[in-house]
């Protein structure tokens, strides 16, 4: 016998309707897209590096994540569209920095979750 699933089908309509009502007001595609972009290891490495270094040029970031400048630029563009990072040009160099420091809270939450729950 599988203890992970119900042995009979029993729908609790009041609970289901409340959950569906709340879900209707929840922007699932945007939140899912946000986590999808952050689910890439290289993007997490980029965010982690920028949290600790304030700003880095694309060449430095490429070296840190051991990727080409083109691949790194693609990752940075995704993070920029998401509003996590921003950039400024200084001569011939483009520097990236964390735009919204709340991303640090999210990363800390992820680390704490892993340590407490997944350990």
Swiss-Prot record:
This is Cadmium resistance transcriptional regulatory protein CadC. The gene is cadC. Residues 23-118 form the HTH arsR-type domain. Metal-binding repressor for the cad operon. Involved in resistance to heavy metals, such as cadmium, bismuth, zinc or lead. Metal binding causes the repressor to dissociate from the DNA. Keywords: Cadmium, Cadmium resistance, DNA-binding, Metal-binding, Plasmid, Transcription, Transcription regulation. Coiled coil: none annotated. It comes from the Bacteria. Residues 58-77 bind DNA.
């Amino acid at each position: 016998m599988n203890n992970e699933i119900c042995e009979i089908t029993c729908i609790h309509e009041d609970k289901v309707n409340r959950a569906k009502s709340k879900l209707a007001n929840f922007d699932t595609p945007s939140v899912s897209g946000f986590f999808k972009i952050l689910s890439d290891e290289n993007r997490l490495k980029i965010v982690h590096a920028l949290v600790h270094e304030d700003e880095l040029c694309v060449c430095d970031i490429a070296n840190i994540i051991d990727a080409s400048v083109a691949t790194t630029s693609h990752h940075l563009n995704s993070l920029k569209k998401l509003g996590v990072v921003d950039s400024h040009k200084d001569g011939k160099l483009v520097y990236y920095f964390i735009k919204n420091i709340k991303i640090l809270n999210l990363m800390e939450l992820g680390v704490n979750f892993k340590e407490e729950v997944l350990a």
